[in-house]
């Protein structure tokens, strides 16, 4: 929200204007899209790479009029950030990174969320670390820092270096998005353990994949998405694509998993262009341009990936449930 409104704020010397276009992958989340639309900007949707579920950077050249990119690091994974950064620089564009599901992921030793003009993070309870609610936005320049600092607190200049000690001096528009001291303390205490939690999630992911592939009934029922080869991922969840020859079993099977204690979710919201809210805004697009995004919706789901070590009993329970798909 703050990053989006900062991009169009008149206080920012170089900024976007109402009507400017921005690129966003069709597999996205509502809070990645709607703040930019609320700023008067126009979305230009782009398909995803079926191997990573993230924005397909090879399609960027087709979006020649866009002034910004909202790049989403899905479930801890990433596009090729060097290619995206080079494209952004060559076109003098803005880049926002939605890093809400990828806290701690690194692309060639550089943290996701630090490539763009702004990086956004979520500390909701289901994420890598949690403060219960809220999140974080990072930026690169003093101008952007002071703008974000003011906008998060009603548009005050309170707390800024340029402040004239007037507690009620409103220098801009703004919101009330300040964290509580209590939630900040909870988040900071977990931040110290982030690297260990990332390692634990990776081990759990590897355990599940190996257990499934070595199951006596394994017959490539699922496809696991690929970590970008230049990425050291901080995994958010455990996504799967059901193979096409058994796709007709998906609905009944997911109902079975949920009723058995294995909670499932769509991969983000699937192809967001199918959401009812998009019809309200009459977005123009060709379905044939989003075949991978539709495949992610049709075949995909994900389950939780715990930070605590998965013991043998839980691992056996989970894999046995997942391997029952062909019985439906």
Features from the language model and the residues they span:
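PLP-dependent aminotransferase class I/II
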Residues: 68-72, 77, 81-83, 106, ...
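Phosphate-binding glycine-rich loop
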Residues: 1-21, 35-37, 45-47, 110
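Active-site phosphate-binding strand-loop segment of PLP-dependent enzymes
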Residues: 50-131, 136-144, 302
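Structured binding elements
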Residues: 40
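Short beta->alpha connector loops at strand-helix junctions that form conserved
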Residues: 26, 44-49
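Conserved coil-to-alpha-helix start sites within the AMP-binding
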Residues: 27-33
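Hydrophobic/aromatic ligand-binding patch that stacks against planar heteroaromatic rings
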Residues: 35-36, 87, 182
């Amino acid at each position: 929200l703050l990053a989006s409104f900062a991009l169009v704020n008149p206080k920012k010397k170089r900024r976007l204007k109402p009507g400017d276009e921005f690129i966003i992958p069709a597999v996205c989340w509502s809070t990645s899209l709607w703040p930019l639309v609320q700023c008067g900007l126009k979305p230009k949707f782009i398909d995803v790479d079926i191997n990573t579920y993230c924005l397909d950077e090879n399609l960027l050249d087709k979006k020649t009029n866009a002034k910004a990119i909202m790049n989403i690091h899905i479930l801890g994974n990433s596009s090729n950030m060097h290619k995206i950064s080079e494209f952004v620089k060559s076109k003098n564009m803005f880049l926002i990174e939605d890093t809400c599901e990828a806290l701690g992921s690194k692309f060639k030793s550089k943290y996701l969320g630090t490539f763009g003009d702004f990086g956004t993070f979520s500390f909701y309870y289901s994420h890598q670390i949690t403060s219960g609610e809220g999140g974080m936005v990072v930026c690169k320049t003093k101008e952007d820092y002071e703008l974000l600092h003011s906008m998060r607190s009603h548009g005050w200049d309170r707390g800024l270096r340029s402040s004239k000690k007037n507690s009620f001096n409103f220098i801009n528009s703004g919101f009330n998005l300040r964290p509580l001291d209590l939630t900040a303390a909870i988040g900071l205490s977990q931040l110290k353990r982030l690297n260990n939690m990332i390692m634990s999630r990776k081990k759990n992911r590897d355990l599940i994949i190996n257990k499934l592939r070595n199951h006596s009934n394994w017959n490539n029922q699922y496809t696991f998405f690929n970590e970008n080869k230049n990425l050291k991922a901080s995994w958010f969840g455990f996504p799967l694509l059901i193979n096409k020859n058994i796709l007709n079993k998906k609905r009944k099977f997911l109902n079975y998993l949920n009723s058995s204690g294995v909670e499932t979710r769509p991969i983000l919201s699937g192809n967001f262009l199918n959401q009812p809210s998009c019809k309200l805004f009459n977005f123009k697009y060709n379905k044939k341009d989003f075949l991978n995004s539709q495949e992610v919706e049709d075949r995909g789901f994900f389950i939780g990936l715990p930070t605590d070590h998965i013991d043998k009993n839980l691992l056996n329970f989970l894999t046995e449930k997942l391997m029952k798909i062909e019985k439906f």
